[in-house]
């Protein structure tokens, strides 16, 4: 009997320097739909040029790679799944972006607590945690304490999952795409 692995999911970068190029995604993840990725960058487009980006719960790295393609200076990708980190590194290499992107295997909460200076340098934080999971609230609470004034946080989440009340981060925009919501928060 053959034990073949299911094929990887394939995505495409929507726009920018590597627009139209293929990305691989690890099996078993829920990649951000291209419509939602495009909507995110329609909202935060002007913030991307020369941005320092952190992509949390990175999966395939599609959100952060899209930022690099659209002119971000650098991106750090955090995911606890070793398969995801390998796929992100492979995607960065195949797109000619390895010098601008760094993939780290780590629990997001632990990494945020251990890397306050790196989080403080970020001008754009992207997060797409598992839907309907307490990790969204926990991650936003950590980011509320760590991101610098002027930074933007973009959270993809289930539209039925309300965002928690936070101290410094305020929701300035929210859009819904089917069961998905995209919320943009900034430090006030």
How should these model regions be labeled?
Residues 1-188:
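Class I S-adenosyl-L-methionine-dependent methyltransferase catalytic core
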């Amino acid at each position: 009997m053959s034990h073949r692995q299911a094929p990887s999911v394939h995505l495409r970068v929507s726009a920018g320097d590597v627009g139209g190029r293929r990305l691989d995604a690890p099996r078993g993840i829920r990649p951000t739909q291209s419509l939602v990725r495009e909507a995110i960058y329609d909202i935060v487009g002007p913030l991307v040029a020369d941005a320092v980006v952190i992509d949390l719960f990175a999966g395939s790295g599609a959100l952060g790679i899209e930022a690099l393609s659209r002119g971000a200076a650098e991106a750090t990708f955090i995911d606890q799944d070793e398969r995801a980190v390998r796929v992100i590194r492979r995607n960065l290499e195949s797109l000619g972006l390895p010098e601008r992107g760094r993939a780290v295997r780590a629990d997001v909460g632990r990494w945020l607590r251990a890397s306050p200076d790196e989080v403080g340098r970020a001008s754009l934080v992207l997060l797409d945690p598992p839907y309907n999971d307490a990790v969204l609230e926990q991650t936003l609470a950590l980011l509320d304490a760590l991101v610098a004034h002027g930074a933007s946080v973009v959270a993809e989440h289930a539209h039925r999952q309300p965002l928690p009340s936070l101290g410094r981060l305020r929701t300035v925009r929210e859009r819904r795409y089917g069961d998905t919501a995209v919320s943009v928060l900034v430090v006030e």
